[in-house]
Amino acid sequence: MEDFRIKYRKLGREKARGLYHEDGLIEIDPRLPAKEHLEVAIHEYLHHEFKHWEESHVEEYGRKISDFLWILGYRRVNLE
């Protein structure tokens, strides 16, 4: 697994929920609801791992994987 970093910042100006940068930086808007956060995190990580995939594949599999994990009960928990 190649190195990647996750940064949380508001992405309103970019009109995005998440962004992937070629240097391995994944940015996620911290205001996302839990299920949307899961989908966006997976979506951006898929861009990292499968750079050759078309956006339609990333969208499809990001949604499928996040739906599967949600059904299993995976949730984001803030421990702050």
Segments from the language model and where they lie:
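Active-site recognition of the HExxH zinc-binding catalytic motif
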Residues: 39-48
